[in-house]
Amino acid sequence: MKRGLLPFNKIKLLLASPEQILSWSHGEVKRPETLNYRTLKPEKEGLFCAKIFGPLKDYECLCGKYKGKRFEGTICDRCGVEVTKAYVRRERFGHITLATPCAHIWFLKSSPSKIGALLGLSARDIEKVIYFESYLVVEYPTPDMEATFSNSENTIPVIKDGVTHHVKLHVVTEEQYEKEFAYSIDNRYESGMGAEFVRYVLSILDLETFAFKLKKILKPYTFGFEDLGPKMELEHKKLYEKIIMFLADRVKLYSVGIATSLNGVQMSIEDVIHGIVSESIYLNIKTGEISNQDLGDDWYTSKDAIRYRFEYVRGQNQNIPVFDKIQEDVRNIVLKDFSDTRVKNLVKTLKLVEGFLKSSNRPEWMILTVLPVIPPELRPLVALDGGKFATSDLNDLYRRLINRNNRLKRLIDLDAPDIIVRNEKRMLQESVDVLIDNGKRGKVVSQHNRPLKSLSDYLKGKQGRFRQNLLGKRVDYSGRSVIVVGPSLKMHQCGLPKIMALELFKPFVYRRLEEKGYATSIKNARKMVDQKQPEVWECLEEVVKQHPVLLNRAPTLHRMSIQAFEPVLVEGKAIQLHPLVCPPFNADFDGDQMAVHVPLGIEAQLESYILILSTQNILSPANGRPIMLPSQDMVLGLFYASNYVKGAKGEGKVFFSKEDAFLAFENKKIDIHAVIKVKIGDTFVETNIGRLLINEALPKGYRFVNEVLDKKSISKLIADIHKIYGSEITAQTLDRLKEFGFEMATRAGISIGIEDMKIPKAKKRLVDKAFHQMDEVLDQYRKGIITNKERYNKTIDIWSQTTEDVTKAMFSEIEKSEQIENGKKLPGLFNPIYMMANSGARGNKDQLRQLAGMRGLMAKHSGEFIETPITSNFREGLSVLEYFISTYGARKGLADTALKTSFAGYLTRRLVDVAQDMVISEYDCGTKKYEVIEAIVESGEEKISLKERLIGRVLAEDIYDPNSKELIAKANDVLDEELTARIQQAGVVQVKARSVLNCESENGICSMCYGWDLSQRKLVSPGEAVGIIAAQSIGEPGTQLTMRTFHIGGAATAQKVQSELIIESSGIIKFQGLRLLKNRNGGLINISQEGVIFVLDPNGRTIERHTVPYAAEILFKDGSEVKQGDIVAKWDPFNTYIIAESSGELVLKDIIVDVTVREEKDTLTGKTAIVVSFLRAKDAQLHSPRIVIKSEDGNEYSYDLPVNSILNIPFEKLKTIWDKCLACSEAEKNDVQHNYYYLDKFVVHPGDIIARIPKETTKVRDIVGGLPRVEELFEARKPKNPAIISEIDGIVKIYEDADEVMVISPKGTKKYDIKNEFILIKHGQEVKEGTKITDTIVSDVSGKAIVRAKGSKIVVYNKQTGQEKVYSVPKGKFLQVKDGDYVKVGDQLTDGTPLLEEILKIKGIDELQKFLLKEVQMVYKLQGVDINDKHIEIIIRQMLRKRVIVDPGDSRFVANEEVDVIEFNKEVERIRKEDGKIPKAEPILVGITKAALSTKSWISAASFQETTRVLTEAASEGKVDDLSGIKENVIIGNLIPAGTGLEEYKNVKIEIAEHVTQFKKQT
């Protein structure tokens, strides 16, 4: 089956054998000469030899004896050159026969080294051999050592004289070699150095035996309890014995009760278990007795007997863990035997060996004996003026190589001393390396210290062959020019300058001149065109009629950056662009340029018309909203016309038709803004002339639009019209609105004057008030009530609030004022600047605030705020200081733009690469899976509504109204606005819908899982390249937003921090997961991390859900009624608190001056705060600062203090005492005294704050901060502060984590070493003799315990299953759980961001997908960017495509191999049919770069990044690219397998109809 235009449909990459290289070659290059300096003809047998590579001129030999086409194919007898086209100099290879074999550096120095991996040597060792530093010795086994050698992991199989031997390889220095191997008598050793000997060893490798051996070594890696049995004992005795020992140990530990005497003979428990497993002993699972024979019911043998016995005993005694725990432990014993790196290396080597076996490659071909010389025209030598030459670097590299090669041949012929020959061989090897890849090992530079470009450099990077010439080519029939606005154009037109059109359409014009008889020949026509005769223009007009052209504006960030238009010929040299298509191109007319391309073929023209025409691209594919909208002047005109003015001329008049009203308006009887009544249909409508005129522009039969039109309402209007009437009518409507908008804006004569910026009268009062509040904050700070960080946070908060208040005051003043224009009184709404901002025409409230309110806070480059706000505005002017502060933000904006544009561009490139082969491949994949879709809620606030998330999706199950039980929508319905509105009204909160994440199509995605094509509002059609659309939709806003930072000029607006919970709708509140304490003022304090408050309506349906932070004060009781606007809870947003849960005396432990805490004395206030901070690293090990509350009932509550926490105890209550520090004394072996803080009878009450941890200071959030977060998520990187999450449900216990405990008593110090046990005492505790320190260690003395803690151990224990998990937490990390808390799977135990891999492992693939989607959406939402979920889902799907094999079963995979999920599923199906053992695999998360590099297509991966590595791997494994993706087809010049390049469209024939009749659009 042939696909596309090319005669093949797959491409395989292999290593070239020497014979293959010779078959390409047309002769050997023996001399390093290039051209003769006098004749400038190529030297014979040189690098440009005409005899080898072909003639310099078409059909002419070098000496000139044969000239002309008639001698084609003749070989000249004088100069030996074949008479043919000179073009063959671009395709004929030569070759160089190397005097000694040389290694190919790609296979030598890739990581891991391919040659090294096959020989089981490290990259360093194999390099030493190749570069003649060390000897390689092959050690053959003696007959009695054969078995040992073949079982050893460190040997490799070779075939010698037809027999396979397992041999050991040694890399030894010259001295070692001389000493140990050189004079060995027995014939066991072969040795040599350099590539030649390595080639010999590679050629005798027995690959089949090698693959078998590696599989055998890897086999036990997957073993578990199920594999126990005689076979395992036979093949893997050591491992088998370890597991038997472990089981015996567990039988003893849990008193499982298995008898140890058989027929009166006493046996060890190990032997009994071995007997049961090997099926020679039977076990009664109820009594634990054993016997030689099967005695009926309850008697079992083999490993299952042990399992049944365990389960039976557990039924009696719940303290024994479930048997799964034992199985898990057995698995861990196996894993301990295999280090991760070892398994990885084994798998890599096995893959390589199997690659060689499958691909018919030979390992010795990685060492070159013949080197190809590429055609001379691809490494040209060009004569410049003045007798100089410009040459390609390759010629220099080939010259060095030929020189060294010839010298080596001469030395060998002369029988030179070994040391000289060896050095020359090494130099030859180095010159081969440099030719293939300069810089991999040493760099060769030109005279100007520039590294020479090697063959690899011609492939890789932006300037390499892939990206420069194959993925992006310069095209003919194109031109570029500056753009200007063309307001009179229709939407599908563009103005094309005549001179440009003439050049672009030249061939068409020639043809038309001939057809019309103006010219008799092409030559004649050319002449006419050159002279620009009048007939030429006439023909040009006819030619361009209905011949679309493509316009493109760089940077091409999404598909709307290229659109088709019908050209309209215009005078001048500038392209005219329709104003409405500026937003999709992101174009303006300040000097932007655009490129024009002419589609030549009839198919191309048809595609341009049907698919790319601007009227087809009204909706954005990123979110389905209109992207072609009136903007700026047009919005202003429409806004102006649609506003009322009370008391305008003609107010209150009544008209019986629109026409009457227009007549009155034309006769100046009524004003355009006057409120009048007009009969529309059967009713009288209150409206004005402006609105009537706007409705004239709307489609016939559309509802009467009677509202003020600003940018948002216009957008809704256009979307609605598009929904009802489709693209064509919408385009016409837009054109009419454009005309009217421009006209009204002109008529209104709106302009900006300095007087329009009204400075609010309240400003001075508000600013003064803020300064007064600032003084209060400073005062609190000086008194030491708050810390410096809190002061900063409060300052920012005050100024953010003040700026907001000033802005409000300014707007309300503008709205109340009056304008007088031409003697006409207009309300404040008509203030020109206000009107521009309010209508969305230009500018926004922020900019208005800066013009007439106050500039507010400015951001530093680090993202923090400068505390001094700019209280002036631009109308008043800034003071010098204020101006200086301003420059900060403005400069940040410009620097950001430069840096972040490239960052966003690179992100887009990675996204495109990872998703490029996602194409709609079928209508329905038939999956039964679905996603549960619900609104995205972030800290109690709904960020993305259910409706927004559902539109355009396909339902997976029927939906019924939860109350009336009637059917709302059926499965497989596509959800549009009406259906989603009905679903929401019914109060459905979760909907099961189809999703890209669950699509089961083999390649690509199916239409049903994808849903709507958002730019067409209909189910996506097959062949749509949805992956690339997704990448563009995510990447484009990134680029946009980073480019847009500097427009605000750095005036930062801090988000006012949420510090209270305000109810939005009345109802009944319900608490879930809150734990409340009454504090000394009677207030209720929440001490749960998981608290949620729900608001329910009278029917008990949830209408709001809010999370409540720890330490929030709750102001209502559970179940009370609340009204809208009630404050239910409030908290301090700037601190995390540690709260006393009980009353009692407060005791400080290990709070030591200048050791575990530092006193922060404030220079301004003279107040002191005590901050936890370890001054030396080892202090953190020796001391654990904590607060203990001793309650009246004798209980102790202990609170660890994390780093940076501040004690909330009045400084004057703290006393200090010098005392001996037992831990330090012990560590430093002499008395160490510390200054301890202590409290004298200090009592606390429940709810008291005993310490606080200040949160990070408020920073400016813009997408510049957000883009790195998006990248962190898509690349699956580790966050800076990873959280620990629980893997099981259970109760939390917290222990000290230490290696030793000391008890210090008057008699002396006693040390106890702790090994893998839990410490039952706390640091600093007084212990009595006999107190348990751990389960097995008891204190021999009474005294004070010193625990040298590294941190804490959190143990989660599940009583039902007996499972427990232990987590080590380093010192200084904040624990979110306390002793005795109950946690669920996936709950966070410490602060920080959870690791994506952990979420995957613990909560599963669905939770991870939800998490990723939400996190990415939040970053964009924060910027007000709408991206449909499905685009992000496509990228996430690509990140989760891979599975890692846990147990290969009977499959062709090996353990730990990463395979594509589709491949895995196919293999599972195959094995199911054959009734074999099914392989097991786990999903893994792969970052987008790695995902793009590990795609099936090696062409696509090589053109993305790390070209040489990808090609090396592809060649050694003999990979086949089946050309299924888009990118690889672009590279080889095929039609792409998407859109109209699909197979279905192959047979569509297109003809040009001579007489075009008026065709109606089929609806």
Swiss-Prot record:
GO terms of molecular function: DNA binding; DNA-directed RNA polymerase activity; magnesium ion binding; zinc ion binding
Entry keyword annotation includes Magnesium: yes
Cited SMART domains: RPOLA_N
Enzyme class per UniProt: transferase
Positions of Mg(2+) binding: 588, 590, 592
Keyword Transmembrane helix: no
Bilayer-crossing regions: none
Entry binding sites for Zn(2+) 2: 925, 999, 1006, 1009
Record note on cofactor: Binds 1 Mg(2+) ion per subunit. Binds 2 Zn(2+) ions per subunit.
One Gene Ontology CC term in the entry: DNA-directed RNA polymerase complex
Keywords noted in UniProt: DNA-directed RNA polymerase, Magnesium, Metal-binding, Nucleotidyltransferase, Transcription, Transferase, Zinc
Gene3D superfamilies the UniProt entry points to: 1.10.132.30, 1.10.150.390, 1.10.1790.20, 1.10.40.90, 2.40.40.20, 2.40.50.100, RNA polymerase II, clamp domain, RNA polymerase Rpb1, domain 3
Cofactor dependence: Mg(2+); Zn(2+)
Pfam family, one: RNA_pol_Rpb1_1
Alphabetical list of SUPFAM superfamilies matching this protein: beta and beta-prime subunits of DNA dependent RNA-polymerase (SSF64484), Rudiment single hybrid motif (SSF51246)
Binding sites annotated in the UniProt record for Zn(2+) 1: 61, 63, 76, 79
E.C. number(s) listed in UniProt: 2.7.7.6
NCBIfam families, per database record: rpoC_TIGR
UniProt function note: DNA-dependent RNA polymerase catalyzes the transcription of DNA into RNA using the four ribonucleoside triphosphates as substrates.
HAMAP family, alphabetized: RNApol_bact_RpoC (MF_01322)
Name of the protein this chain belongs to: DNA-directed RNA polymerase subunit beta'
Gene transcribed to yield this protein: rpoC
